Amino acid sequence: MNKKVKNDMGNELIRIFEYNKPQHAIIVILFKGRRLPKYCAPMPRNPGPKINISLNNDLSEIYFSALKENASIKDGAILIQLDRGIPILRGFSYRLFPPLLKTSRLKNMGSGYNSSLDFSVVKRVICVYFINKNGVKKFTKGKEKALFKLKANKLHKFKHIMENPGNK
């Protein structure tokens, strides 16, 4: 994933976090390839949100617009395909059922956190972002990094992970 796409995605996720303040957990999956990754299935929605559209730094706008149209889209993961460096929104409300990753994990983190961790090692998944009341985490190949964290009712943006990939 190129640096511009990483920075743009990071900015969009922080906008979602700031606006959501955190009413519900949000999972965003970036993947490559022509097909959706294994171990996920769409949940039917009516009305269905607009999908299969190129994102141009407007994921937060599209997400909250879709949420107004049908609040049930908040249940499930958002899938974004990277096609030649261009992010394309492929869908909302995906159920995840990845195989269990055999790694030590934090206790009491919930199903969204654990599904994000496990799904990050699925073939063709670039990374999984998990947004909840504590901030934004990025899972890549079973490794977790905090991108943004809420402390004392203030949002602190960590140095962008792209600038300092070794920091957690």
Residue ranges and their predicted role:
Residues 1-168:
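Divalent-cation
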